[in-house]
Design a protein with these regions (language model features):
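Post-HEXXH active-site segment of zinc metalloproteases
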Residues: 1-14
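An active-site-proximal "capping" alpha-helix that borders the catalytic cofactor pocket
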Residues: 11-27
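Generic structural signal for bulky hydrophobic/aromatic residues embedded
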Residues: 21-24, 58, 107, 131
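Short alpha-helical patches at coil-to-helix transitions and adjacent helical residues
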Residues: 14-15, 19, 48, 52, ...
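Long, amphipathic alpha-helical stalk/connector segments used for oligomerization, subunit docking
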Residues: 23-93
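C-terminal, non-catalytic "cap/extension" segments appended to globular domains
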Residues: 77-158
Length: 158
């Protein structure tokens, strides 16, 4: 894993699980239309987590100024001054605030996709998540290694 994944491993474990659990709550509920509920969740998650992380990279790594960030955000319908002020101020004042959740969610979602592909019909998300949670908090590469061993044992069980 990269430096950022190692540096944010433990906060990413907690925050990533929180984001993934919110997604599961929507997927497993049956009170509301699932597609509509997912859209609302992703609409909230995209600007709240992912766009904050992206804007922080744009400002702090690429060196974008406020006007340049406004141009970038306009491509996503977020070019109004209030949005730009929010994202720019967050990037300057809290440059790493959104990274643990964004990276943690991405790592956990990737791990679950990999396990699903490896286990095929034997994949049970609830069992995989219970096993994942029993190992953590831990660094991503260690979690993946342990989950691979667990997946191999599931295949051996048949």
């Amino acid at each position: 894993p990269g430096l950022m994944q190692r540096a944010l491993a433990l906060p990413g474990y907690y925050d990533g699980w929180g984001a993934y659990a919110a997604e599961l709550a929507v997927l497993w509920q049956d009170r509301f239309d699932q597609a509509a509920a997912l859209m609302r969740l992703y609409d909230a998650m995209a600007p709240g987590v992912l766009m904050r992380a992206i804007c922080s990279i744009k400002v702090n790594y690429e060196g974008l100024e406020r006007g340049e960030l406004q141009e970038y955000l306009s491509m996503y319908g977020l070019g109004e001054d209030a949005h730009v002020d929010f994202f720019f101020d967050a990037a300057v004042n809290e440059p790493f605030a959104a990274f643990p959740q964004a990276l943690g969610y991405a790592q956990l979602a990737d791990l679950m996709r990999s396990l699903s592909a490896d286990l095929g019909a034997a994949y049970r998300e609830d069992e995989a998540l219970a096993q994942y949670l029993s190992y953590g908090p831990a660094y991503g590469d260690l979690l993946r290694e342990r989950m691979d061993v667990w997946a191999d044992a599931q295949v051996d069980k048949g």
